[in-house]
C-alpha cells in the first residue's frame, strides 16, 4: 500500500513539473505595475499606423523608477520617441499630429490623468505595485475623447461605481450620493471600481478613516462606511473653472450580522436586591463551561 501511495505521489510531481511556471504565477503581480498602450480613437482604416491594444503587460517596479520607465520597459522592442525628454510623441509609428491638430499621446495612472509628467511620478511616492498605467492616443480636444475634457473639469461626479462583491442599492446614478452595499456573510474585503465623469479629477477612497488606493482590497465589516471623493477643491483661475469635489458614501451591510462596535452593558436602574441576584461571569468561567 505504501509503495502504491509513493508511486502516485511521484506521478503527481511529474505531472506538475510539466505545467509552465507562468500558470501558477499568472495572478501573482507582487512588485509589478500593469501597463496598457492603446489607440481606440484613430482607426487604421483612416490612416493610423495601427489601432487597438499594442501592449497590455505587467512589468517590474524597480526602486526609484518612474511611470515613464515602466512604459518604456513595457514597450520593449516597439519604437517610441521622446521618453527621455519626458513627453512621448510617437509609439510604433503612430505620432502626435497624425490624427489631427489636437492628436497625440496621453496617459492615466489608475484612471486619472496625472497633473505632473510621467517622469515625475516615482515608485514609493505616487507609484506603487498593483497600479495601472494606461497610455492612450487622443484625436479630439486634447483628451476629451478618452475621458479628460478640459471644458468640463468642474464636473466632479462619478460616471460609474461598482464593487467586486455584493449588491449596491439603490442602483447607481451620478446624482445619488448615498448607498448601501449588501455583502454575503464571510466577505472581509472588497475592491472598488469608480469612474470619474471627467478623468482629470482624481478619485479618492476612505474606509473607516483609512485611505486606500483604487487598486487595493479594502477590509470591511458590517457597518463599514466607505467615503468616495471625486476631485480636489480649487478656486477658479484664468484657465480653469472652480472645482468643488463630490462625495459619495457607501455603508456596508453584512447579511446576518449586527454592526460591529463596543458592547455597552448597563445595570443602571436596577435596585440593590436585583443587583445582588445577578451572577456575573468572566472569560475563564465561559471556557470552563460554568
Go through each PLM region and give its residues.
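Loop/turn positions that initiate beta-strands
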Residues: 129-133
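Positively charged n-region of N-terminal signal peptides that target proteins for export
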Residues: 1-5, 9
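Sec-dependent signal peptide cleavage junction
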Residues: 16-31
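Hydrophobic, secondary-structure "cap" segments at the distal end of domains
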Residues: 67-125
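Short, charged beta-turn/beta-strand-edge "cap" motif at the junction between a beta-strand
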Residues: 136-146
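Short, tryptophan-glycine- and acidic/Ser/Thr-enriched carbohydrate-recognition patches
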Residues: 282-290
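Beta-rich interaction/scaffold domains
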Residues: 146-278
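Eukaryote-biased recognition of intrinsically disordered, low-complexity regulatory segments
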Residues: 27-58
Amino acid at each position: 500500500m505504501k509503495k502504491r501511495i509513493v508511486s502516485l505521489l511521484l506521478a503527481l510531481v511529474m505531472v506538475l513539473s510539466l505545467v509552465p511556471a507562468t500558470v501558477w504565477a499568472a495572478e501573482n503581480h507582487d512588485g509589478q505595475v500593469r501597463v496598457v498602450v492603446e489607440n481606440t480613437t484613430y482607426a487604421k482604416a483612416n490612416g493610423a499606423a495601427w489601432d487597438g491594444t499594442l501592449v497590455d503587460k505587467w512589468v517590474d517596479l524597480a526602486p526609484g523608477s518612474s511611470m515613464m520607465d515602466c512604459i518604456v520597459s513595457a514597450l520593449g522592442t516597439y519604437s517610441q520617441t521622446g521618453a527621455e525628454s519626458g513627453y512621448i510623441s510617437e509609439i510604433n509609428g503612430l505620432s502626435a499630429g497624425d490624427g489631427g491638430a489636437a492628436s497625440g499621446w496621453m496617459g492615466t495612472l489608475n484612471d486619472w490623468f496625472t497633473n505632473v509628467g510621467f517622469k515625475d511620478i516615482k515608485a514609493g511616492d505616487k507609484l506603487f505595485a498593483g497600479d495601472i498605467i494606461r497610455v492612450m492616443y487622443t484625436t479630439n480636444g486634447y483628451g476629451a475623447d478618452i475621458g479628460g475634457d478640459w471644458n468640463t473639469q468642474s464636473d466632479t461626479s462619478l460616471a460609474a461605481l461598482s464593487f467586486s462583491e455584493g449588491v449596491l442599492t439603490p442602483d447607481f446614478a451620478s446624482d445619488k450620493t448615498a448607498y448601501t452595499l449588501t455583502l454575503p456573510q464571510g466577505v472581509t474585503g472588497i475592491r472598488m471600481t469608480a469612474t470619474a465623469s471627467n478623468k482629470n479629477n482624481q478619485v479618492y477612497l476612505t474606509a473607516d478613516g483609512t485611505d486606500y488606493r483604487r487598486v487595493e482590497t479594502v477590509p470591511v465589516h458590517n457597518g463599514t462606511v466607505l467615503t468616495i471623493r471625486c476631485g480636489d477643491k480649487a478656486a477658479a483661475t484664468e484657465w480653469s473653472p472652480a472645482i468643488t469635489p463630490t462625495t459619495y458614501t457607501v455603508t456596508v451591510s453584512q447579511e446576518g450580522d449586527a454592526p460591529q462596535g463596543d458592547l455597552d452593558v448597563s445595570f443602571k436602574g436596577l435596585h440593590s436586591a436585583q443587583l445582588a441576584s445577578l451572577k456575573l461571569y468572566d472569560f475563564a468561567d465561559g471556557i470552563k463551561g460554568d
